[in-house]
């Protein structure tokens, strides 16, 4: 393992961002050597087995259907050999090659699938007894199972195996995103492993843990490293985020104790916050909290700490568990809400301005009076000037521009969250997450995030998704079933203004 760490540190600058994924770095720090592996050695390609040999030995053959219940499990040493070999490969191209080979050459037996699919059709046409039809269907299901699934299944039962599978899927996810590994077989394997991890990481196996300043340093460091929404600036900032009027929780797994899987930060306030700076920046540090002042819980950051668990439903369960925990500890809390970023809004808006200018020769997202007011301030009426304005943060330094852009950007943002869809659901991923959970699209906040990052991503706007606990189940069912978005009067008013004033 030390050799692997040294190799990764040397290779990192040369192989680029996929070389040492953040999820892998965390696993390497915490995992230690694999059982049966000395800290100095792993199977390498120099003088060792070839990739094809390792895969052939490690991936068990699918036994005949008739003997599937009697087939012995694969030898533990073969699975351990696979782990050692994988961890000994260069992160990046060589791992991508192995994953591609595993997905392509050790998948389902398509010949058998075709054979027994034909028998299912034959049984239906001949109207044979129900038992024969069900058995034929069962054979199809059996041969649809990819061979690599048995390897994953066995690895999941070994000590340290679940941690390794999360690491491997993290490499798959990051490799697919970087196009380092691609193709339908690889995407299918990533999906198969995701479904297996969803079962292993179901709520019954998860522990809810609260982070305080007295938590182990390793945990505090992981909380800081994993913060993806509002980066932690220093230890003072971190201490504030786990101190009075703040809560930080994470899920861990019984097989990977103490390792954060997904993290939720909560601010305890007297009202529904409209600005993230009031929560994470320049906040007076208090030694104690007055419970009587707390009436509201604000979920202001939720971050997945393990890339390999992407797509596994953890966030909704974490919020529900935290709500129950807060209700038990602080029963006076009346309101639960998020204070969420709006990633992608600026990019969407600039793209829309470009397409309108190209198709219509003019910008019709803003009213004539709004265009006139902005052109008087900028001394330029072209759409290109407006696009440049929105893609840098200089405009927020002008009070006149901030005032002039307030109304058009608020209604455009409302439409982006409420009206822009992907397959019928909200295009914005954060909106889709909270709406699936049953929250209400409640309030859009002008200048809710005045950091450079917030200005660049969403023109400084943030949004509250309210969790009315008595309505979350029905809201979620309506959104998932009929794609209906529950929204407040404020949001619907802005949407109506957009439909009246803007042309798409």
UniProtKB/Swiss-Prot annotation:
Residues 202-504 are annotated as: Catalytic domain. Pathway: Metabolic intermediate biosynthesis; acetyl-CoA biosynthesis; acetyl-CoA from malonyl-CoA: step 1/1. Residues 1-50 form a transit peptide. GO terms for biological process: acetyl-CoA biosynthetic process; fatty acid biosynthetic process; malonyl-CoA catabolic process; positive regulation of fatty acid oxidation. It is found in: Mitochondrion; Cytoplasm; Peroxisome. GO terms for molecular function: malonyl-CoA decarboxylase activity. One of its GO terms (cellular component) is mitochondrial matrix. Pfam families: MCD (PF05292), MCD_N (PF17408). Its EC number is 4.1.1.9. A motif (Microbody targeting signal) lies at residues 502-504. The record marks 222 as: Essential for catalytic activity. Keywords: Cytoplasm, Decarboxylase, Fatty acid biosynthesis, Fatty acid metabolism, Lipid biosynthesis, Lipid metabolism, Lyase, Mitochondrion, Peroxisome, Transit peptide. Its main location: mitochondrion. Residues 51-201 are annotated as: Alpha-helical domain. It catalyses: malonyl-CoA + H(+) = acetyl-CoA + CO2. The active site is at 340 (proton acceptor), 434 (proton donor). Catalyzes the conversion of malonyl-CoA to acetyl-CoA. In the fatty acid biosynthesis MCD selectively removes malonyl-CoA and thus assures that methyl-malonyl-CoA is the only chain elongating substrate for fatty acid synthase and that fatty acids with multiple methyl side chains are produced. This is Malonyl-CoA decarboxylase, mitochondrial.
């Amino acid at each position: 393992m030390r050799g692997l760490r040294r190799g990764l540190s040397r290779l990192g600058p040369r192989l680029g961002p996929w070389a040492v994924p953040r999820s892998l770095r965390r696993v390497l720090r915490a995992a230690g050597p694999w059982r049966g592996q000395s800290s100095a050695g792993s199977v390498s390609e120099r003088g060792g087995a070839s990739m094809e040999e390792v895969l052939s030995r490690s991936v068990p053959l699918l036994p005949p259907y008739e003997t599937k219940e009697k087939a012995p499990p694969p030898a533990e040493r073969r699975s351990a050999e696979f782990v050692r070999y994988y961890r000994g490969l260069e992160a990046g191209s060589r791992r991508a090659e192995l994953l591609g080979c595993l997905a392509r050459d050790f998948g389902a037996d398509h010949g058998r699938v075709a054979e027994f699919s034909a028998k299912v059709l034959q049984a239906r046409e001949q109207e044979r007894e129900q038992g024969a039809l069900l058995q034929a269907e069962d054979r199809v299901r059996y041969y649809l199972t990819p061979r690599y699934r048995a390897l994953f299944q066995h690895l999941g039962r070994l000590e340290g195996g679940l941690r390794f599978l999360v690491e491997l899927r993290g490499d798959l996810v990051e490799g697919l995103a970087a196009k380092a590994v691609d193709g339908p077989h690889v995407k299918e394997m990533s999906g198969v492993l995701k479904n297996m991890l969803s079962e292993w990481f179901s709520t019954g196996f998860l522990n809810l843990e609260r982070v305080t300043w007295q938590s182990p340093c390793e945990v505090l460091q992981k909380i800081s490293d994993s913060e993806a929404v509002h980066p932690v600036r220093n230890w003072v900032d971190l201490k504030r985020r786990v101190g009075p009027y703040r809560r930080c929780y994470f899920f861990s797994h019984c097989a990977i104790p103490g390792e954060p899987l997904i993290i939720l930060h909560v601010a305890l306030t007297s009202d529904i916050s409209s600005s993230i700076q009031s929560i994470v920046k320049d906040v007076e540090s208090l030694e104690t909290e007055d419970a009587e002042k707390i009436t509201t819980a604000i979920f202001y950051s939720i971050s997945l700490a393990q890339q390999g668990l992407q797509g596994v439903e953890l966030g909704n369960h974490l919020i529900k568990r935290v709500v129950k925990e807060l209700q038990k500890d602080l029963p006076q809390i009346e309101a639960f809400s998020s204070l969420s970023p709006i990633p992608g809004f600026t990019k969407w808006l600039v793209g829309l301005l470009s397409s309108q200018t190209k198709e219509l020769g003019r910008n019709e997202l803003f009213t004539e009076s709004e265009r006139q007011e902005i052109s008087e301030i900028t001394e330029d009426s072209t759409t290109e000037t407006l696009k440049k304005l929105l893609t840098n943060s200089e405009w927020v330094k002008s009070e006149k521009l901030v005032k002039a852009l307030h109304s058009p950007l608020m209604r455009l943002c409302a439409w982006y969250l409420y009206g822009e869809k992907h397959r019928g659901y909200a295009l914005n991923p954060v909106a889709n997450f909270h709406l699936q959970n049953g929250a209400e699209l409640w309030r859009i906040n002008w200048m809710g995030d005045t950091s450079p990052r917030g200005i660049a991503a969403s023109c400084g706007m943030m949004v509250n998704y309210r969790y009315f606990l008595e309505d979350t189940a029905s809201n979620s069912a309506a959104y998932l079933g009929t794609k209906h978005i529950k929204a407040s009067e404020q949001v619907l008013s802005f949407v109506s203004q957009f439909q009246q004033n803007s042309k798409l």
